[in-house]
Amino acid sequence: SLDRYADGSFDAVFSNSVIEHVGAPAGAEAMAAEVRRLSSRYYVQTPNRWFPIEPHYLFPGFQFLPVWAKAWLLRHLPLAWVGRIADPEEAERVAREVQLMGAADLHRLVPEATVERERILGLTKSIIAVR
């Protein structure tokens, strides 16, 4: 928690690939509110939900699967940084952890920001709210 800091305590707030890990929608809304409270200038980047390869697991379309399918894949395949997860409960927890968002979702959280797009081969890889 950043409660110990007064409103406007920072010249700028920088967040790179964090907001998708804090729990959607409530956690993401709370984080966006904290960013906006701490500074009028900020940079909030997150991977784009609509990019074909999920960046945390390096698996095509992983973000579109139901939790049970994500957990199954996590238990049976060594995906990116997590490897293979033997424990079913841990696999389900990890499957729920990342909640990617699209540009409209990010803009809804910080409506006064400009939403930029980082592209690779013409596809939007990540989205960035800048103010």
What are these regions (language model features)?
Residues E112-L123:
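Conserved S-adenosyl-L-methionine
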Residues S1-F51, I127-R131:
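Conserved SAM-binding loop
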Residues E34, R41-L73:
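Conserved class I S-adenosyl-L-methionine
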Residues E92-T114:
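Short alpha-helix
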Residues P60, L79-R93:
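Short, glycine-/aromatic-enriched active-site segment of Class I SAM-dependent methyltransferases
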Residues V98, G122-I128:
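Short hydrophobic/aromatic beta-strand or adjacent loop that forms the aromatic wall/cage
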Residues V35, H107, E118-R119:
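A general structural signal for short secondary-structure junctions and capping/turn motifs
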